[in-house]
């Protein structure tokens, strides 16, 4: 039986899908059929290569050992020509092929690139190391690169689509295109090879699209006629402006007729000089009132130069895109507004744009001693003019003088305490029997205080309820003294220990009568007559009250020297005990004064560097703190011992109970929340501390705080209330700019904020403002 050879003896089969047969040869011998194929893939050098594989594939259908004897193992040939059968009489010789990369002999399949041979595993990319036998590759500087690395390092992108260019390319004006990407700008059709391309400086046009451009109407604008006078421009220079030609003397301002030789401003195709343009169409700066040229900063309906838009608090310019607050004609930084708000909360009094002024008027009996004027928006109006203001405006926007009580606000300062002590206030009993001279002095001082509300530093009081119940009742007051009393007597209440209660500043009598001195400008209080019997009974009651305030119910002799003349009571201490302490205090006080002076100068130097309201606020607090410490050092053992302080002159006079101008305490309502000028919810009554003399200061309401608006806010759609930055959003006059959310319907409010209005009011201020900013209602 004939023996057949295995494939291992004849060679390996290898082929490529993209291979093509370049030559074939058939050899027939006694029933045998042999095919020899040379598989080779050739491409133009310089383009993308596919690995050149060349192998001799021998397909042996049937071999007869008598006709053909194998001479050895058939291997892949690297010769570009077909290897013919070896001569059986000569031994076969194979050339040794070495790999170009590793230098080892090549066995089995070999890749040939041009004249170099590689193992399949050795033919890889120089950069990423990927296999190049299965895909295309590029040769650059003797190195073999894959497509991605070559394009990334040395590739050229198409100017039209941005992709890498391979194969055929089109180069025009130094730019490279794909053939399909180099197209007409107007009709988008690719340019045919050899076609003429028109480039007008921006676009590439084909012949069809470039023909209308040559005969466009623009060429008529550059005619030889002057656009000003209409005559031909012959010899001489022509001025080209506004796409027209002009004589040099015909290019004039449309408004003033001045010949324009330098800069000009065009409006609707007509030239203007800068002066006339600003006068006709210019925009003025709200700060410097000069016309704005160039960049303009717009805030609401107001316009500013970038250098003129400064914060009214810190005087710093606003940068582009910075947030600002607009209040009236002033602009604020958000941080400066917060510091101003804090400073106003710390002030004991607050001034407002709406205040009451007092001017000297007539002093005729029965007429007011001062004429009341109201200041509204920097304009002083007489009360007759105020009557012509609409009712709503009069109630909510200005103060009504007939509802204002001119009650001074007493602080706990050291000067006020000395003044009260000098007026004869008793530390233990407020109202000892006064003398006529002392009472007149007290009365003059109190009237001076109550009538000095129009001064610059005087406190200004707020609006309050315009239906007080106490202001319409007859006013009665019991005034002890040597003068005959007028009006109905009002006995003072007694404590359980039979001691009389004396009114303090916070507990003034509800009914009293003061003789008319022109204080009340609207009505004259009635005068009540007193019968002789009632007068005698009243005199007896007054004596009981008067003498009950002295030891043994006996008034001391005015000529008698007080027994106690020292700060220490009930008896003077020994000098041996208090002497060293007094010396140490006197010596230490001088050192403390020097130290305080040095610290104060250092603080002023540091704080003056902070050119802001916050720095001034800190300086003011430090100075007030030092003054309080200094007053505490000067204070005696007891706040105000009667007839014991040697440096305070003794006096037998006593002051009247504290009262305001018309004698009524301001009615304060605590049943409602109040809103300050920033829209914050605050308590109805300010918390007051007890004064050093044990009395409560007169309660008052802050300036600018009134009863809540009883009118229901109008409801507007959310789109009308929304604040945007793209365009000018004019908010209606009926809308409160600081409380835009109040004009939303309850269901819309809940849909936007996810809560009710009452729940929203209970949130802190920063949280409410943040939610309003997100909803574009801030």
From Swiss-Prot:
The modification Phosphothreonine is found at residue 433. Residues 97-156, 156-216, 224-283, 283-343 form the LIM zinc-binding domain. Detected in liver, heart, skeletal muscle, brain and retina, where it is concentrated in the inner segment and in the outer plexiform layers. GO terms for biological process: animal organ morphogenesis; axon guidance; cilium assembly; cytoskeleton organization; lamellipodium assembly; positive regulation of transcription by RNA polymerase II; transcription by RNA polymerase II; visual perception. There is a cross-link at residue 620 (Glycyl lysine isopeptide (Lys-Gly) (interchain with G-Cter in SUMO2)). Gene3D superfamilies: Cysteine Rich Protein, Villin headpiece domain. Pfam families: AbLIM_anchor, LIM, VHP. PROSITE patterns: HP, LIM_DOMAIN_1, LIM_DOMAIN_2. Residues 360-369 have a biased composition (Low complexity). Residues 710-778 form the HP domain. CDD domains: LIM1_abLIM (cd09327), LIM2_abLIM (cd09328), LIM3_abLIM (cd09329), LIM4_abLIM (cd09330). GO terms for cellular component: actin cytoskeleton; cytoplasm; lamellipodium; postsynaptic density; stress fiber. Residues 339-370, 414-510, 552-597 are annotated as: Disordered. Residues 590-614 form a coiled coil. The modification Phosphoserine is found at residues 216, 367, 422, 426, 431, 435, 452, 455, 458, 498, 587, 640, 655, 677, 706. It comes from the Eukaryota. Keywords: Actin-binding, Coiled coil, Cytoplasm, Cytoskeleton, Isopeptide bond, LIM domain, Metal-binding, Phosphoprotein, Repeat, Ubl conjugation, Zinc. It is found in: Cytoplasm; Cytoplasm, Cytoskeleton. Transmembrane segments: none annotated. The modification Phosphotyrosine is found at residues 373, 396, 439. Residues 423-434, 449-474 have a biased composition (Polar residues). One of its GO terms (molecular function) is actin filament binding. Binds F-actin. Interacts with ABRA. This is Actin-binding LIM protein 1. The gene is ABLIM1.
């Amino acid at each position: 039986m004939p023996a057949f050879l295995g494939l291992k003896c004849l060679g390996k089969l290898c082929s490529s899908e993209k291979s093509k047969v370049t030559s074939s040869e058939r050899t027939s011998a006694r029933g045998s059929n042999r095919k020899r194929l040379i598989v080779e893939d050739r491409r133009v050098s310089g383009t993308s290569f596919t690995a050149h594989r060349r192998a001799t594939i021998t397909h042996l259908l049937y071999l007869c050992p008598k006709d053909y004897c194998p001479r050895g193992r058939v291997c892949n040939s690297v010769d570009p020509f077909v290897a013919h059968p070896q001569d059986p009489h000569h031994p076969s010789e194979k050339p040794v092929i070495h790999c170009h990369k590793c230098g080892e002999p090549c066995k089995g399949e070999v890749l040939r690139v041009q004249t170099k041979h590689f193992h399949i595993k050795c033919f890889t990319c120089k950069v990423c190391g990927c296999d190049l036998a299965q895909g295309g590759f590029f040769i650059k500087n003797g190195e073999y690169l894959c497509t991605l690395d070559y394009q990334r390092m040395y590739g050229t992108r198409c100017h039209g689509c941005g992709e890498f260019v391979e194969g055929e390319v089109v180069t025009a004006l130094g730019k490279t295109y794909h053939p399909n990407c180099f197209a007409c700008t107007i009709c988008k059709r690719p340019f045919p090879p050899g076609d003429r391309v028109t480039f007008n400086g921006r676009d590439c046009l084909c012949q069809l699209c470039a023909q209308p451009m040559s005969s466009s109407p623009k060429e008529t604008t550059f005619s030889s006629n002057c656009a000003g006078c209409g005559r031909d421009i012959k010899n001489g220079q022509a001025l080209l402006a506004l796409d027209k030609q002009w004589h040099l003397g015909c290019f004039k301002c449309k408004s003033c007729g001045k010949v324009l030789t330098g800069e000009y401003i065009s409006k609707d195709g007509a030239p203007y000089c800068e002066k006339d343009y600003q006068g006709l169409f210019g925009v003025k700066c709200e700060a410097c009132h000069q016309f704005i040229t160039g960049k303009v900063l717009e805030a609401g309906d107001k316009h500013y130069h970038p250098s003129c838009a400064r914060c009214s608090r810190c005087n710093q310019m606003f940068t582009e895109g910075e947030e600002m607050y607009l209040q009236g004609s002033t602009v604020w930084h958000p941080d400066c507004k917060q510091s101003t708000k804090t400073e106003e909360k710390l002030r004991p009094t607050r001034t407002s744009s709406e205040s009451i002024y007092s001017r000297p008027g007539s002093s005729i009996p029965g007429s007011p001693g001062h004429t009341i004027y109201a200041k509204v928006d920097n304009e002083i109006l007489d009360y007759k003019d105020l009557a012509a203001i609409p009712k709503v405006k009069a109630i909510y926007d200005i103060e009504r003088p007939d509802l204002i009580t001119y009650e001074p606000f007493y602080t706990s300062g050291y000067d006020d305490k000395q003044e009260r002590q000098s007026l004869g206030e008793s530390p233990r009993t407020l109202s000892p029997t006064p003398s006529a001279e002392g009472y007149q002095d007290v009365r003059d001082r109190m009237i001076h205080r109550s009538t000095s509300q129009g001064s610059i530093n005087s406190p200004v009081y707020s609006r309050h309820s315009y239906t007080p119940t106490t202001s319409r009742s007859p006013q009665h007051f019991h005034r002890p003294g040597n003068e005959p009393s007028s009006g109905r007597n009002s006995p003072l209440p007694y404590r359980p220990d039979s001691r009389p209660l004396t009114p303090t500043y916070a507990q003034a009598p509800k009914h009293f009568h003061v003789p008319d001195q022109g204080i009340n400008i609207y009505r004259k209080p009635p005068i009540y007559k007193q019968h002789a019997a009632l007068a005698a009974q009243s005199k007896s009651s007054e004596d009981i009250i008067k003498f009950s305030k002295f030891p043994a119910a006996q008034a001391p002799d005015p000529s008698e020297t007080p027994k106690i003349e020292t700060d220490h009571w009930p008896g003077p201490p020994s000098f041996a005990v208090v002497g060293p302490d007094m010396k140490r205090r006197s010596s230490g006080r001088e050192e403390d004064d020097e130290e305080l002076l040095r610290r104060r100068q250092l603080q002023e130097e540091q704080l003056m560097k902070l050119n802001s309201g916050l720095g001034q606020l800190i300086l003011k607090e430090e100075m007030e703190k030092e003054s309080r410490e200094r007053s505490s050092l000067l204070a005696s053992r007891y706040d105000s011992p009667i007839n014991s302080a040697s440096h305070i002159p003794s006096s037998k006079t006593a002051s009247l109970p504290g009262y305001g101008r018309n004698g009524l305490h301001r009615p304060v309502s605590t049943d409602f929340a109040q809103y300050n000028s920033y829209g914050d919810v605050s308590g109805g009554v300010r918390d007051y501390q007890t004064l050093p003399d044990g009395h409560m200061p007169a309660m008052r309401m802050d300036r600018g705080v009134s009863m809540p608006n009883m009118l229901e806010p109008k409801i507007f759609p959310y789109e009308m209330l929304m604040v945007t930055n793209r365009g000018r959003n004019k908010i209606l006059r009926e809308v409160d700019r600081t409380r835009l959310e109040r004009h939303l319907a309850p269901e819309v409010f809940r849909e936007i904020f996810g809560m009710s209005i009452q729940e929203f009011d209970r949130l802190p201020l920063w949280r409410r403002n943040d939610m309003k900013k997100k909803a574009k209602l801030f």
